[in-house]
């Protein structure tokens, strides 16, 4: 929500063209120290993200009107966020609003497809899958500070809006 409010100002500092190259720089010592302090906790955080992602999958898998990630056997996904495709855009808007009102930071992730942001020589209707994702994708938090109550609140909101 904070990002959405500050987006007009932040957009002034964003690139408006694809990058031509990537510059590798040395990290400041503060970042090195911070990284060394946090790195030992990484495995715990990855495990919690994995657990929360699987829990959301099981809480939402029986709802119609949703498409969830395909979880293959013998694969250990460590979710950055949990992606959900919601077929009905009006329901997506209501779900997003209710989640935000409940204090659950969800996001559309892609405001628009890349070929709409930059003049890359493509037509607006090109890349139909990217266009669909931009209109129907909602991502849910799975970070280590998401608790079982948050996950159940997410399920309740989806249930109330999709029944």
PLM features: what roles do these ranges have?
Residues 1-163:
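PLP-dependent aminotransferase class I/II
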